C-alpha cells in the first residue's frame, strides 16, 4: 500500500502497464473525515478490518462520530485516477466531493459509506440519489471529467 490515494492509484496502474505493455488506468478512492484527521482515508474499504464489510465500516464510523455535532462532521470523498503509459509517462487526476457525515443511514442506493455521506449543496446522501444525480456530483465522476479535459486538450 502507498500512503495516499494518488500513490495507490499509481501502484495499480504501473503494475498493469508493466504486465501488459499497454496504457493502464487505475483508481483509488475513499472517504476522508476532517475531525478524524482524514480517516478512514486510504483504509476506507477495510476501516473495520478484514474481510471488508460495508456495514461494519459504517457502524465503526458512526461510533467514532457519535460525540460530534453536525458542524464538526465535515468530510469529503476523494478519487484519484492514474494513467500510466508504457514509456513511463504518468498522469493523475483528482476528484473531490465535499459533504458531511450524517447521524443515521439514509437511502437505499449505492455502496460503502453512501448512506452516511450527505453531499454539500443537497439535502441527500449518495444513497438517496439516483444514479444520474450521483454521477453529476460524485468524486469519481469529477476525476473522470478532469481526465477527459486533459485528453481533449492534449490528444485531439
Predicted regions and their residues:
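Anionic-ligand binding patches
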Residues: 1-156
Amino acid at each position: 500500500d502507498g500512503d495516499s490515494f494518488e500513490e495507490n492509484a499509481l501502484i495499480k496502474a504501473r503494475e498493469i502497464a508493466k504486465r501488459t505493455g499497454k496504457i493502464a488506468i487505475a483508481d483509488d478512492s475513499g472517504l476522508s473525515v476532517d475531525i478524524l484527521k482524514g480517516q478512514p482515508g486510504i483504509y476506507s474499504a477495510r476501516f473495520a478490518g478484514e474481510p471488508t464489510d460495508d456495514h461494519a465500516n459504517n457502524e465503526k464510523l458512526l461510533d467514532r462520530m457519535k460525540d460530534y455535532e453536525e458542524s464538526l462532521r465535515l468530510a469529503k470523498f476523494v478519487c484519484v485516477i492514474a494513467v500510466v503509459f508504457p514509456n513511463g509517462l504518468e498522469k493523475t487526476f483528482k476528484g473531490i466531493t465535499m459533504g458531511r457525515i450524517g447521524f443515521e443511514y439514509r437511502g437505499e442506493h449505492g455502496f460503502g459509506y453512501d448512506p452516511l455521506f450527505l453531499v454539500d449543496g443537497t439535502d441527500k446522501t449518495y444513497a438517496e440519489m439516483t444514479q444520474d444525480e450521483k454521477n453529476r456530483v460524485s468524486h469519481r465522476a469529477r476525476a473522470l471529467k478532469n481526465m477527459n479535459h486533459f485528453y481533449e486538450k492534449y490528444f485531439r
